[in-house]
Regions:
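The feature marks helicase ATPase cores and/or their adjacent C-terminal helical subdomains
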Residues: 1-476
């Protein structure tokens, strides 16, 4: 029972871990354990979406605000180091992606100091770390330093450890967790599927998990619950099957995630498929937004307005289908073009001419807005498009002096606000949707996924799972 496990977590005076499979009520468990606490607990996770999810669950279960503080590991470590700049050796308020590991090292060193331990101990009586499989090795070192003087509970799922760290590696549970932390328990009820009235799917996924842990294969010709749809295809018909499967998901307003694996090559596949679907499904971007920031840097570096506009058109084609059809031949060449009675889309032409005459952010935003509402076009990378429109708004409103600064500022804001997209039909990679829940999940190329990617993909849909592939047994 999770109530008993919550009490066990609250009573823990040393350091332990809980195995929490996807969709089994981990956030609920944390909230119940904290509700039983006689003091203030520190809860650390990895994303601001995770922070908000925990806060919402705390409110739902009536946990008092005085009983907890929830934050990301990154922002908590940064704030502690900035509070003691001399002792920590850290003064950078906005670290770049390559500076975070150094920050974690500084924070770990700081936590070794007696006066810091006393300060932290006076603020909290215990620690919870959520989504522990997403910890890097340097974050794990930081947590271990906290665990030396605070009762610490780690909650996570080694089967979902698919994060790619630019500089560092994910924590190895076999080496760093199991031998050094006590096992406090494992969650057993697949609540996500129980609540979605798909208990058979939940039990099937629980069995799938057991097989993956034992290194066994999943037989897709064995009896499957009605909510698991196996779509067999020959390799040469894979793209056609993907298209047909997604078209079949368009007749309702329920959320759908179509998934490729988490490798770099798969990112391009998601955008290509969204383009093929003419934007009826929209692809999602990596949090870092490399394509956006690369474009902004190129745009501000151009020597001529014409060269800048040609870059703009190229970027627009990365976001929307049908862009060339909405532009006149002269506009496509980056020329101010005269409006004629035969001009098919005068509003687009006028917006392009305005930008070519005065290349301001307001004219650029107007051009994209006009393109977006044109009948020839359809946004297929809404996430990318809306991020860029938000960057332009920040620049127009005077919150940043340059477009590059506006991009950096928006990137920081987005970590709190989340992706600027509310489209219900999405295409992404396992890496981008880990921890998220949708009504339906479609695995686009099951043969290509390893065991962990496969498990993450299979557990995203609360009501149904469609598996497209060429083989009978998975992982292939």
């Amino acid at each position: 029972m999770s109530e008993d496990l919550a009490i066990k977590l609250n009573d823990c005076t040393s350091k332990g871990y809980v195995i929490a499979p996807a969709g089994f009520g981990k956030t609920h468990l944390i909230a119940m354990a904290v509700r039983a606490s006689g003091g203030r607990q520190l809860i650390l996770t990895h994303t601001f979406a995770g922070v908000n999810s925990i806060k919402t669950k705390m409110a739902d279960l009536g946990v008092r605000a005085s009983q907890f503080q929830v934050d990301t590991i990154a922002s908590w470590a940064l704030r502690l180091c900035l509070a003691y700049p001399k002792a920590s050796g850290w003064k950078i308020e906005n670290p770049t992606s390559k500076q975070w590991n150094k920050l974690y090292e500084c924070c770990s060193h700081l936590l070794g100091k007696r006066f810091i331990r006393e300060a932290v101990s006076s603020s909290y009586i215990g620690l919870y770390v959520d989504e522990y499989q997403d910890c890097s090795d340097v974050q794990h070192d930081l947590v271990c330093n906290l665990a030396e003087f605070l009762p610490s509970r780690l909650l996570g799922d080694p089967l979902q450890s698919i994060f790619d760290f630019d500089d560092g590696k994910p924590v190895d549970w076999e080496v760093s967790v199991y031998p050094k932390f006590d096992c406090l328990g494992q969650l057993e009820v697949p609540w996500r599927w129980v609540k979605a009235k798909s208990p058979e799917l939940g039990e099937w996924l629980k069995n799938v998990r057991r097989k993956i842990e034992l290194g066994q294969k999943i037989d897709l010709l064995a009896q499957l619950p009605p909510s698991v749809i196996r779509t067999y295809t020959q390799p040469e018909y894979l793209a056609a099957k993907q298209y047909t499967a997604l078209c079949g998901m368009l007749n309702n307003n329920e959320s759908v995630i179509a998934l490729h694996g988490g490798d770099n090559q798969s990112k391009n596949k998601t955008h290509l498929l969204a383009k093929t679907m003419a934007g009826r499904f929209s692809s999602i971007e990596e949090i870092e937004g490399k394509d956006l920031h690369s474009f902004i840097k190129k745009l501000v570096a151009v020597k001529t307005v014409q060269a800048g506009f040609l870059l703009v058109v190229k970027f627009a084609m990365k976001c929307l289908t049908g862009v060339p059809s909405a532009l006149t031949a002269g506009t496509r060449r980056g020329e101010v073009t005269k409006l004629r009675s035969t001009t098919k889309y005068p509003l687009v032409l006028q917006a392009a001419n305005d930008y070519l005459t005065d290349p301001s952010s307001s004219h650029l935003k107007a051009f994209f807005e006009t393109l977006k509402s044109n009948p020839e076009t359809s946004a297929y990378r809404r996430d990318l498009l809306y991020r860029f429109l938000n960057v332009l708004k920040i620049h127009i409103d005077g919150q940043a002096t340059t477009l590059v600064e506006a991009g950096i500022l928006y990137q920081r804001e987005m970590r709190h606000s989340g992706r600027p997209i509310n489209h219900r039909k999405l295409i992404g990679t396992t890496l981008l949707v880990k921890g998220l829940e949708y009504d339906h999940a479609v695995i686009l190329d099951a043969d290509s996924l390893d065991a962990k990617d496969l498990y993450v993909a299979m557990t995203r849909g609360a009501k149904s799972l469609t598996i497209i592939g060429t083989v009978r047994h998975l992982p292939a």
